[in-house]
């Protein structure tokens, strides 16, 4: 058919139809049907066409692909057809009889009188064999239908009487009548109730359970509604509790010698498992259906358990269950302990929704739209990965504690919910940082790395990472990292460098550091102008709040002089600068490199004379950058 619009008189004047064929893709060659209304609207399915025309137009007989009305052809059955079906099984018997009659006449004509007895005997034998085969087939069919069956409830053998219901085939007449009466009684209890139990005497709904809260007024007015959970008859037997008809359900007392009865009961808790002799046989049959076919066949062939006489076993007094649980199977309730709450909750085989229906979170109807669970929902633009209810709608009684909002959330609904994201995996550190941490064998916060003398190599600049400081020729470096107990080794150090760990005293106050980065580097032609001096803060008379470091025994001690009055005044000013926040100093937790040079070949004579000045300069200068002029003024 051409892909042009054609008239469709079946729908009325003005309607057009078009069939377009697919020319590419996996469905090449298939066609799509389109219809165009008199107003120009394009319709491509029968559902859209029904919605467009409305309920007044019946399209049950309309063929959407052909565009025609298909009237059903009435099926006419001739009268001769049933008669032919009836005569079909009788035709082979007649033909056999005719063939046997012809054989008899031929034998009588062709054979003499003394020889025709044997063929007739063989013919009669063949007839008897065929008749016996047909009779044996019918007998086997009748025998299979009337084979003795063992009753699944009482265990007696009975003959099958042609019951069509599959669940009643394995029950005898008495057990079948009890089963039918029990089902009829249970239906009455579900509709009306017994009228005697405590639940049937309640006349008003609680208004708290999920049935009362989810019910619409129109359902209540029409009468098609579920009963309140507190008004449901107590004589209703749930499927998980048993059928109430078999021997296991009718047993009222525990045996006292099975593995369940011999368990020591916990104080304050009811037993969760039922005695093996009181378990329903129907439940065992249902569980075997879920297993393999071999297990079901074995279960059907296994004989029923013999009843245990009560006279052989004396029931011990400490295992008597009458004071722990009711004896009636209808009132026997299992309990389970929740992981978060130490309260007893009724045990059911069905999936439980964790809500009580009475707390403020359960009564809340609207999502907050700001917690992490709401942000994950598709209606708020999320990816639907967590699939959890709003944190502010999680039940306060049954929900898990990790799903509830944090305690410090305050009055704001969306505040305080980010601490739950601490369970996520940490971000991976770059490979360079991991190599630096693994390559450092030291555990002390300070480490001294001495570079061998020699000219500065250009490869060091290439090996130095971003943000690192290149070592100066013939200098010693002191690496200090606040907030950690591991030393960091900067790139570019020699393999034969000496490492001396220094043990730091445990101090809770923040440690002040001396930072002299970006010192002007001299040319490599004059290495004798640089003289390396490594200084350790060993004085116990330093300012309060600074940790003292142990000195290296290999280095020569530094002469210390008592501070003068000017230094005392400056120390008092430095005490005020200690109160400045860490952000002004340059941040906490950044590695600091201390380099001390004796410019002009002179050695440093006193550490306490210039240390307070450097502290003051470090507190004032936020960028931790010192010019060469400031360095010379402070050192000299």
From Swiss-Prot:
Q: Which Gene3D superfamilies match?
A: Methyl-cpg-binding Protein 2, Chain A
Q: Where are the zinc fingers (CXXC-type)?
A: 187-234, 235-281, 348-396
Q: Detail which positions bind Zn(2+) 1.
A: 194, 197, 200, 233
Q: Name one GO cellular component term.
A: chromatin
Q: Does the keyword Transcription apply?
A: yes
An example molecular function term from Gene Ontology annotations: unmethylated CpG binding
Give the principal location in a single coarse category.
Answer: nucleus
Q: Where is this region: Disordered?
A: 75-113, 291-314, 407-474, 543-589
| Annotated InterPro entries | DNA-bd_dom_sf (IPR016177), Methyl_CpG_DNA-bd (IPR001739), Znf_CXXC (IPR002857)
Region: Transcriptional repression domain (TRD), residue numbers: 550-612
Q: Which residues are listed for Zn(2+) 6 binding in this entry?
A: 368, 371, 374, 390
Question: Crosslink Glycyl lysine isopeptide (Lys-Gly) (interchain with G-Cter in SUMO2) sits at which residues?
Answer: 117, 293, 443, 461, 520, 559
> Could you say which residues bind Zn(2+) 4 here?
255, 258, 261, 275
User: Where in this protein would one find the motif Nuclear localization signal, according to its record?
Assistant: 84-88
Intracellular or extracellular location(s): Nucleus; Nucleus matrix; Nucleus speckle; Chromosome
PROSITE patterns linked to this entry: MBD, ZF_CXXC
Where, per the database record, does this protein carry Phosphoserine?
409
Question: Subunit comment for this entry?
Answer: Interacts with OASL, ATF7IP, ATF7IP2 and BAHD1. Binds CHAF1A and the SUV39H1-CBX5 complex via the MBD domain. Binds MGP via the TRD domain. May be part of the MeCP1 complex. During DNA replication, it recruits SETDB1 to form a S phase-specific complex that facilitates methylation of H3 'Lys-9' during replication-coupled chromatin assembly and is at least composed of the CAF-1 subunit CHAF1A, MBD1 and SETDB1.
The free-text domain remark for this protein reads: The methyl-CpG-binding domain (MBD) functions both in binding to methylated DNA and in protein interactions. The third CXXC-type zinc finger mediates binding to DNA containing unmethylated CpG dinucleotides.
Report what the protein is called. Answer: Methyl-CpG-binding domain protein 1
Native species of this protein? Mus musculus
Annotated gene: Mbd1
């Amino acid at each position: 058919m051409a892909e042009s619009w054609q008239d469709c008189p079946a729908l009325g004047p003005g309607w057009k139809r078009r069939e377009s064929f697919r020319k590419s893709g996996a469905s090449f060659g298939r066609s799509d049907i389109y219809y165009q209304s008199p107003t120009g609207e394009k319709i491509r399915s029968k559902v859209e066409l029904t919605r467009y025309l409305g309920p007044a137009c019946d399209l049950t007989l309309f063929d959407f692909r052909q565009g025609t009305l298909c009237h059903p052809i009435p099926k006419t059955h001739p009268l001769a057809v049933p008669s032919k079906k009836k005569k079909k099984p009788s035709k082979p018997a007649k033909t056999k009889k005719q063939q046997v009659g012809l054989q008899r006449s031929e034998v009588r004509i062709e054979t003499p009188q003394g020889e025709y007895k044997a063929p007739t005997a063989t013919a009669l034998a063949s007839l008897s064999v065929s008749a016996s085969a047909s009779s044996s087939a019918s007998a086997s069919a009748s025998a299979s239908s009337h084979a003795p069956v063992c009753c699944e409830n009482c265990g007696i053998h009975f003959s099958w009487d042609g019951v069509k219901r599959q669940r009643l085939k394995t029950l005898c007449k008495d057990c079948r009548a009890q089963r039918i009466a029990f089902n009829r009684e249970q239906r009455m209890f579900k509709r009306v109730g017994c009228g005697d139990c405590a639940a049937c005497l309640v006349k008003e709904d609680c208004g708290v359970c999920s049935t009362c809260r989810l019910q619409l007024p129109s359902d209540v007015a029409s009468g098609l509604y579920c009963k309140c959970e507190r008004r449901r008859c107590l004589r209703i037997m749930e499927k998980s509790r048993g059928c109430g008809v078999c021997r296991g359900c009718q047993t009222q007392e525990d045996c006292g010698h099975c593995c369940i009865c011999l368990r020591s009961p916990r104080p304050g808790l009811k037993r969760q498992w039922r005695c093996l002799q009181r378990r329903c046989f129907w439940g065992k049959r249902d569980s075997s259906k879920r297993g393999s076919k071999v297990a079901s066949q074995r279960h059907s062939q296994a004989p029923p358990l013999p009843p245990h006489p009560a006279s052989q076993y004396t029931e011990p007094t400490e295992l008597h269950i009458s004071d722990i649980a009711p004896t009636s199977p209808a009132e026997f309730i299992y309990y389970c302990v929740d992981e978060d709450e130490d309260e007893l909750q009724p045990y059911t085989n069905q999936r439980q929704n964790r809500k009580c229906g009475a707390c403020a979170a359960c009564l809340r109807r609207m999502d907050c739209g700001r917690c992490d669970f709401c942000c994950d929902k598709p209606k708020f633009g999320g990816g639907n990965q967590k699939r959890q209810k709003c944190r502010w709608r999680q039940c306060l009684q049954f929900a898990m504690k990790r799903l509830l909002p944090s305690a410090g959330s305050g009055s704001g609904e969306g505040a305080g919910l980010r601490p739950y994201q601490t369970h996520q995996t940490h971000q991976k550190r770059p490979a360079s940082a991991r190599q630096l941490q693994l390559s450092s064998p030291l555990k002390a916060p300070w480490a001294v790395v001495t570079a061998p003398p020699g000219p500065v190599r250009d490869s060091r600049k290439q090996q130095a990472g971003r943000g690192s400081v290149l070592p100066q020729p013939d200098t010693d470096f002191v690496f200090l990292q606040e907030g950690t107990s591991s030393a960091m080794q900067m790139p570019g150090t020699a393999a034969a460098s000496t490492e001396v760990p220094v043990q730091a005293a445990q101090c809770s106050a923040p440690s002040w550091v001396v930072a002299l980065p970006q010192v002007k580097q001299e040319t490599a032609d004059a290495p004798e102008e640089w003289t390396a001096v490594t200084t350790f803060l060993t004085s116990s008379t330093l300012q309060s709040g600074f940790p003292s470091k142990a000195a290296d025994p290999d280095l020569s001690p530094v002469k210390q002089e008592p501070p003068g009055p000017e230094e005392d005044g400056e120390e008092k000013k430095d005490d005020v600068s200690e109160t400045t926040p860490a952000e002004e100093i340059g941040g906490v937790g950044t590695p600091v490199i201390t380099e001390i040079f004796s410019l002009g070949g002179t050695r440093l004579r006193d550490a306490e004379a210039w240390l307070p000045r450097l502290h003051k300069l470090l507190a004032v200068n936020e960028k931790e950058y010192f010019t060469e002029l400031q360095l010379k003024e402070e050192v000299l």
